[in-house]
A protein has these predicted regions:
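C-terminal and inter-domain tail/linker signature
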Residues: 28-324
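Secretory targeting and sorting signals
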Residues: 1-33
Length: 324
């Protein structure tokens, strides 16, 4: 779900938006190394040939490996300043969709080195990680300077041959106050865990959220809220009130102000009870629009919680790729 009409999303400062990869998990480095190795004995740099296939280890092990590697790369580059993780886990022809970051593994290493020099006390608090197919999504609070609110960040990584091949992200400043009293990161619905639910729920929940997004966002049909959203609905978009009534009021005002809104979902990533939708929204024809990631939690066949991150698409890009 996008923001209300009264709030225009601001493009983050160039130093923030230029992050080549912008989420690093609060997972002990040793645990991440161990997890990556155990899930994929021939992980790049762990004794196997670079680019070794993950086939043969089972789907669950492959997904666990991808999540562990994504966190390992980010922790290495942005918390420890260890650029060797890029050589081990990132393809040289790494494709970058962050509009202020160049393509390639070499560019990532250069940026990581500069990052550590400029923000030696930065923290990366990953709240939740999901993986489906060859994609991994991480939702994080990134704080460059201790004591500040930081930014909300979603990173999406595509894996190829056991290595990170491509990256998209969406970044948004964390505001001082919210319309619903909730922060942008916590889990309120029960059980209060950031981990995704059982894997057998993935296909059903992905289908449910995809249908919901098609109706409420693409077709702007607010009756979809009654069909798909549970009576206890927790909202983390800082500009929309809590609950079902808040969602209807906030989105109704947004659609009324922008009747020509066009929303185009680009990819859907699901694991267990968490489903993320990466979209391009354009409020007014001719505008560049916004990159949006909506993250939904589904419990007992109903959507019970929602987080999102929204970023304006800038005029220029340091690479030849779009944000999508």
């Amino acid at each position: 779900m996008n923001t209300t009409a009264s709030v225009r999303r601001r493009t983050l400062a160039a130093a923030i938006a230029a992050l080549a990869l912008t989420t690093v998990g609060a997972v002990p480095a040793a645990a991440v190394d161990s997890s990556a190795s155990a899930a994929h004995p021939q992980a790049p740099g762990r004794g196997g040939a670079p680019g070794s296939s993950t086939a043969g280890y089972g789907e669950n092990a492959r997904l666990a490996y991808q999540k562990a590697v994504a966190v390992q790369v980010l922790r290495g580059v942005f918390e420890r300043g260890d650029m060797t993780v890029v050589d081990r886990f990132v393809r040289p022809d790494y494709i970058q969709h962050n509009p202020l970051a160049p393509d390639g593994a070499a560019a990532l290493k250069a940026f990581g080195t500069a990052w550590r020099q400029q923000y030696p006390d930065a923290t990366y608090d990953i709240k939740r990680v999901i993986s489906e197919g060859d994609l991994v999504l991480l939702h994080s609070n990134v704080v460059l300077t201790p004591g500040t609110r930081g930014i909300a960040a979603v990173d999406i990584f595509r894996f190829q041959g056991g290595k990170v091949a491509e990256h998209w992200d969406v970044l948004q400043d964390v505001p001082a106050t919210t319309a619903n009293g909730n922060d942008m990161f916590s889990t309120i619905s029960r059980p209060q865990t950031e981990a995704p639910g059982p894997a057998y729920l993935t296909a059903y929940n992905k289908k449910l959220v995809t249908a919901f997004v098609e109706r409420y966002l693409v077709k702007k049909d607010l009756s979809a809220i009654d069909t798909y959203v549970g009576p206890e609905y927790h909202q983390h978009n800082p500009y929309i009130p809590d609950g079902v009534a808040g969602a209807k009021a906030g989105l109704g005002a947004y659609y009324a102000q922008f009747p020509q809104l066009v929303a185009t979902p680009k990819r859907v990533i699901a694991e267990g009870d968490l489903v993320a939708v990466h979209s391009h929204t354009v409020n007014v024809p001719g505008e560049r629009g916004q990159a949006v990631v909506d993250l939904f939690r589904v419990r007992n066949g109903r959507i019970v919680e929602h987080w999102d991150v929204v970023q304006d698409v800038p005029e220029t890009s340091a690479n030849d790729n779009t944000m999508f």
